[in-house]
Amino acid sequence: RRAPVIATWGTAVLFGAYALGSAVSAPDVLTSALLGRGDDQASVAGTAAVLMDHPPMLAGALSFVIGHLVGMVLVAIAVVRAKVVPWWVGLIIAVAQPVHVVSAVVVPNRLLDVVLGWGATTVGYALVAGAVLRTADEEWDLQPQPR
């Protein structure tokens, strides 16, 4: 209601990112299937490398990573600007995904990712969901408020 443009952009970016998320997991699925049927590890590794280095796969994976990072930050800004939650909830959501990228890719640390990456994202969105559930029926479908 109070931040429809940024909320729409955040949602669209996240949708696009998660739609391309299969580009991240496809090599894992392929590797598992080929090893499961008995292919040798060297040829499976070579095939997976070819798949991961293929331009559409690289573009999809990169779009997923950048999109879910940017989309989460946009949604965090939107829920704060719309006054759905306090600023610190938006900060939790906005910071959680950069922490996830660092803890999952740059400095692999599963505990950091679970607690401050996806864990913080979960807590932030749970707080947003709680606020939405507490919103009175008459507050829905109102015209945007002027700034």
Stretches with model-predicted labels:
Residues R1-R147:
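Hydrophobic, aromatic-enriched alpha-helical segments typical of multi-pass transmembrane helices
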